[in-house]
Amino acid sequence: MSSAANEGCVYLFIVVLRLSSFSCVNSFIHSFTRSRTRSSYSLDERSLVSYSIVYVAMNKSSKAFQVPNKVITKEDITPLSRSHTKKADTRGTADGKNTTASAVEATPIIITTARSIDTAGSLSENATEDDGTQNGDLHDDDDDDDLESTLGYSSEPDPLFSPCHQPSFTNSTFSYSADNELPMEENHNKNNFHDSSESSIFLPQIQQSFFFGDNSKSDANNTDFWKEVNGTAEEAICLQETRQRKCSLVALHPGDATTSSNDTLGIEDFIKDDINSAEAMEPSPSSSPSSSLLDNLDYNIKLLCYRDNEGKFTLKKRKFLKNSLRSSSAISKKWKPLSKRDKLLKRAIRRKSGVCQTLSAGFGIGEFML
């Protein structure tokens, strides 16, 4: 309770001492701290703490109180624009007042981006006019340049966003490099592009006439993209070979040719034309159309049924089978009937194997479990 009372008295004295002068406060605090014998702090440390508390309480508007609390005043803010600082300096000298506050109250920084390239030309022109009218203080200009270089801001437009790779056709020369075929612009003046902001509207047309010639016209429409193109007929591709064969047959047999108005062929006509073409390729009186189809293994139509041209059902003869086996590369084995002895032997082997499997089942399971 005594320590709490002592602390309350200390805060009460601090509030009272805010109304007194600074010299009286120092002596009073020293006398008060000497009278306190139960405090754990030494005399010098206690006096230093109380002195700092009273000093901060009396001078709240000073930098000692504002900097630790992260309070930034207008005095800490430096001017950022060259033209605005010069205007503020002239007004301040005429009125006889401080110029730092007026410089801070100027308009904010204009950050040059890709969208503000057109407006950057007019801003740079105004800045150059202000520089031409006020060339008296060279020392102030150097200080402003140093300040802008340290802060990283500048009133001039950033050349990074200016399209230097595009030809501006204003007081500039072009040079062709070895690696690049397009002309590279060599600007002797950085503000050439921004001075001709009005002519930048017609820059794409000038570039097009420069690179592709005056006769080039960009008349491409959406209809050209969706223009219909005649495709290939799949039926004509499939029946191209059959038509060629039909023409060859007509040339060989002009009497058998029948005139047809339709170009498309049916399935029956397609098969007949193939059979006739096979007969024309291999003419032989003894061979029939079925035999020619069997002998030619690379033919695209196989035998559909065992009927002849008259519609009667006929089986294959043994000659055709022998011819087909000889022409094919399949290995044929002669069929031999099994004797009774072989049949009994197979049955005995099956029985023995079954008995062995039943006897050795227990041993196999035991070995598997181990």
From Swiss-Prot:
Glycans are attached at residues 59, 98, 126, 171, 221, 230, 262. The keyword Signal applies. Residues 81-101, 123-167 are annotated as: Disordered. The keyword Zinc does not apply. Residues 139-148 have a biased composition (Acidic residues). Residues 1-27 form the signal peptide. Keywords: Glycoprotein, Signal. This is Putative uncharacterized protein YGR079W. It comes from Saccharomyces cerevisiae (strain ATCC 204508 / S288c).
